[in-house]
Amino acid sequence: MILESAAVIYRGFPKRLHHAVPHWVETRALFHIRMTLDCEKKQRALTQPNLAQALLDSAKFFENKQRWHITLFLLMPDHLHALLSFARDQSMSGIIGDWKRFHARKNRVVWQEGYFDHRLRADERGEQLSAKLNYIRHNPVAAGLCDKPEDWTWIIDPFG
């Protein structure tokens, strides 16, 4: 094992990534976030209607409380995609941890540890943002869950 500043490396792969946003990242930077269910546990699908509505309602609640800003938030049966931005004085990992813990307690959702995040750089936002939006919106179609992106129910898409 080799210790590096951003991750512990095991067999060439990060064992754990740290999600601290560097101080030089612009305010309201946009992040592609992916959270996944723990597949080893028996799970209710995130798209089960009561759970899906609770997840979407709490995502909107977090936005109303200015914990994050939603550009896109889409539920799949075993994971979710979100394009979110956070105020500079907010901890991205803290906010996501709070949201996941809330659903772990209230709805017995068992999440995989951590989450994936990728910052969309300001100079790439136009093309890269369009590609990310398209990819996420078409995820249910690619999985055979609906015929067209606009048929998918479990989404918050303020710009779509």
Could you tell me what each predicted segment is?
Residues 1-160:
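Short catalytic/metal-binding and nucleic-acid-binding patches
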